[in-house]
């Protein structure tokens, strides 16, 4: 067992991924030096098409998930909206909300995974703001615990103003149908008010971030107006080609034994830790 990497499946060494990256490196070079707002590598279209099939929703590949949050959230959240953020939400989400503070957007922070407190805040804010955004993680990066997705979906059904923005990069690949993550594994459908962000830098085995949207309107808004598209360079062709190869592995049965092998290792570790009297903060079936 190796505890120093977020490459939970070891898929970054898969021959198909390496071969795809090498081929693209030879054919397109080390970089494609242009903003996506002007000229886009053809690899993006194929990668985003595959991700859209995996998640069943429009998908947008970003240079990183941090840049994805900084690009997406300021466009999605309006000046008359309010944000309720889990106290353990990833720092990259918190960095994006700092930009919204400059617009005087209302931001409340609530205790970790406390749905009772969240609902009380919704009741207080719902008559004062147009939309309410809940920001949190799918799998939290510090303790490896999960968001209560079923409860969040229930609240989104109960309160029309509530929208969910979840970062599930630590859940990507090792769980969920086609490796789509913990959120999609917890509830096997994409809520109409869910904005699910994830990425390829952990168990997926390549690099970059991913934003998914409930409909084409939000997708086009971020793709057309997002600063991360207009003022940032593209991912290298080799990374995009590797991402396409990894997508194809995820959409095949090949991903299943990799997930099962990791689950067996997690169970083994938890069992041995208990036998040895080691303190484990949370006994989740999580690699974090």
What are these regions (language model features)?
Residues 7, 108-165:
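Active-site phosphate-binding strand-loop segment of PLP-dependent enzymes
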Residues 75-91, 265:
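Conserved PLP-anchoring active-site segment centered on the Schiff-base-forming lysine
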Residues 64, 85-101:
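Substrate-binding/gating loop at the entrance of the active-site cleft, primarily
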Residues 186-221:
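Active-site PLP attachment segment
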Residues 240-257, 271-276:
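Amphipathic alpha-helix from the class-I
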Residues 1-30, 162:
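N-terminal "arm"/small-domain region of PLP-dependent enzymes with the aminotransferase-like
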Residues 256-267, 274-288:
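Conserved PLP-binding catalytic core of the aspartate aminotransferase-like
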Residues 19-64:
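Conserved N-terminal alpha-helix of the aminotransferase class I/II PLP-enzyme fold
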